[in-house]
């Protein structure tokens, strides 16, 4: 073989290898044409894709990518709110039974079955997104184990990310950002009620629809829940006082049916998990934009005549100290593992 022929052969091999890299073959092997067509149902707690930015990010990244990488053979249908007729509190059970394949949910609805995920809504444990991320990473192993144990391995946590900050809005001014005595405040659950009572107020648990009616009728003088939802509901038309305390943020979780997952071809499993991991990383990178969107929402309240009371760093520290008994009681009620995770979080945060 001539020297030129050898050089040509080497060059040809290099060109072929570069082509394979550029076409993605080095990362994603070609899928077999014999792989089956599969359709999954992914239910989202948000009532629509516009309601929750994090849900939108997941849906618009994972679903098209999985479809493209499987040549259109693995389709994931996004279902919003009540389309399947499954209440958010029942998502894990629906996944465990195989009636649902994926669910995006606010885990606060599932604290009854999985008490340890109540750690994500401990009031005043975190006061900014940097602190939130620290605690989320510490708590995640406990959440993964809890989902697995609660549903006998039939439910798996695949994505964890930030939800929205809970703030207090009122029709009647509070005595101070530290003193809510004399106010009846709508809350969504027991943890929120404990926080309101610690601040001297009275918490009343109602549904979302009942909250709006109660505000109009004066049954309650305020609401304590995530600020984005209150803005979307135009509560600024009734509540003219906003107390920015970043009381709790909470998680969103994407949970998956292992029954459905185990039925997938290995190629589909790998692609799905890869795309979920990419979307999760992207969602963490959008924490700063979440803050900017909060600023935009706050301006909407200001433009509608609301008084904005921003907690100072000293007030946030004092509020956090007042809530320590709540953290310790909740963790103790959950069990030793929750106590240990809380200790790790407090050490990491210096609280």
Regions found by a protein language model. Name each.
Residues 133-146:
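Signature of the catalytic double-stranded beta-helix
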Residues 26-131, 146-351:
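N-terminal secretory/targeting leader peptides
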Residues 1-39, 351:
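Short, low-complexity disordered leader/linker segments with a strong preference
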């Amino acid at each position: 073989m001539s020297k030129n022929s050898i050089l040509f052969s080497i060059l040809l091999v290099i060109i072929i290898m570069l082509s394979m890299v550029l076409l993605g073959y080095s990362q994603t092997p070609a899928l077999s044409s014999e792989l089956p067509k599969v359709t999954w149902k992914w239910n989202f707690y948000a009532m629509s894709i516009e309601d929750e930015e994090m849900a939108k990010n997941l849906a618009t990244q994972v679903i098209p990518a999985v479809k493209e990488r499987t040549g259109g053979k693995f389709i994931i249908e996004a279902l919003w709110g009540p389309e399947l007729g499954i209440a958010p509190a029942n998502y894990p059970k629906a996944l465990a039974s195989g009636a649902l394949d994926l669910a995006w949910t606010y885990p606060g609805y599932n604290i009854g079955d999985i008490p340890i995920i109540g750690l994500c809504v401990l009031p005043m444990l975190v006061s900014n997104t940097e602190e939130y991320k620290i605690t989320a990473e510490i708590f995640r192993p406990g959440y993964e184990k809890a989902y697995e144990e609660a549903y006998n391995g039939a439910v798996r946590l695949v994505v964890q990310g930030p939800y929205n900050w809970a703030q207090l809005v009122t029709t009647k001014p509070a005595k101070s950002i530290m003193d809510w005595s004399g106010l009846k405040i709508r809350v969504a659950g027991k943890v929120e009620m404990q926080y309101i009572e610690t601040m001297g107020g009275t918490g009343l648990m109602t549904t979302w629809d009942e909250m709006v009616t109660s505000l109009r009728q004066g049954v309650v003088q305020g609401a304590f829940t995530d600020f984005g939802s209150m803005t979307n509901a135009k509560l600024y038309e009734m509540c003219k006082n906003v107390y920015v305390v970043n009381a709790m943020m909470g998680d969103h979780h994407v949970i998956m049916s292992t029954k459905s997952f185990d039925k997938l071809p290995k190629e589909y499993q790998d692609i799905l998990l890869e795309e979920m991991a990419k979307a999760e990383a992207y969602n963490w990178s959008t924490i700063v934009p979440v803050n900017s969107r909060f600023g935009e929402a706050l301006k909407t309240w200001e433009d509608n005549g609301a008084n904005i009371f921003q907690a100072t760093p000293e007030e946030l520290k004092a509020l956090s100290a007042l809530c320590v008994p709540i953290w310790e009681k909740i963790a103790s009620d959950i069990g030793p593992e929750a106590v240990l995770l809380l200790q790790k979080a407090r050490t990491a945060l210096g609280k």
